[in-house]
Amino acid sequence: DSPSTPAAEPLPTKEQLLELCDSVRTSLRHSKSLGPHADRIQSLLERALKDELNHTQSLDFETLQYARLDKLLTDVLDPAHRPSPLPLRFRADMALCESLQKMWRARFRDQYFSLDQVRQRSLSIGGEMRDIHFTASGMDPLESWAVSNSCRDPISELEGNQQFEPGHWWLNLACAHRDGVIGTAVEKPTKGKYGITALPLLTGREEHIRGNLYRYVREGRLSDMHVSLLTRVGTQIRILRGYRLKSTLAPHAGVRYDGLYTIRQYGNKLDAATDKYRLELLLERVDGQKSLDEVQQVPLPSQLDDWHAFKKVEAEMVRQRKGDDGLLDFKMRKEEERIDREHWRRASEFKASLGQEGCGLGLIMSV
């Protein structure tokens, strides 16, 4: 045995292992490296391979499934995550992962190949999709989930404040409603179970003004103008951001709690030409919270795994309720929104580059 991996060293718990795998997978995606925990994951994988070869397996299937070790191997072997030129150490890591993948496939057989289906099923049974159901009657055709009535239990405000740290993440608004951070699965300001006003920003757009100050804008009917916030100017509210929001702060998937913000200004006006109202909110992030840089690491790779599984479940629900044509329409709407967001992202990046070159020209353009 090498001194770095003594046989007596206990394996991490499955929770610690999941955290480690998430960290390494994040590094692979962002920097094409195993990141700051490279040595730790390498020694763990080497030990797992040695155990397989000696038939003294210390990793059970439940741990492998929980920590997403199969996904870690796939990510290391994914050509998209390969640095160029390829360092010798990374080549060795790939060979290690390939050997381990073969050993696990041989040992677990069908169980290994059906891991994703098992995870998909367990989403609804105690997982991220617990206590929510699909509904075709929602106001927003892309938010077709609601809370099942059986799960509503009042929790004290003290518990509530401890429960939601910035960076808390859900698959959709219904999941956030189920956990009590908001009072309904609709994009409007509500008080959750704990008496704190929360506003989900799912649609519309947002721009960074300076420091902790952001401007949120949306167009729509008067009922979309969050008029109740007029009386909340100067007070703190919880802000949730969803992946459909046109904002550099929007999560890549699902809905994320981003912390407490103070409403600095509220304004809405009717555009006579379009007969639409325009809402503008000036929001300032409260100091002393987990930094936005940290919050923006969420969703983690394991949460994105859940997100991809959820999308498959959702597509199947839409197909069952609305047929193939309904599913096609649903997918087209999502794709149109995605393209629209992509255009917005490119335009805002271009604007930002102009701002840097032209001494604040970007700010003038964005007003």
Predicted features, each with a name:
Residues 1-257, 262-367:
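Epigenetic methyl-mark regulator signature
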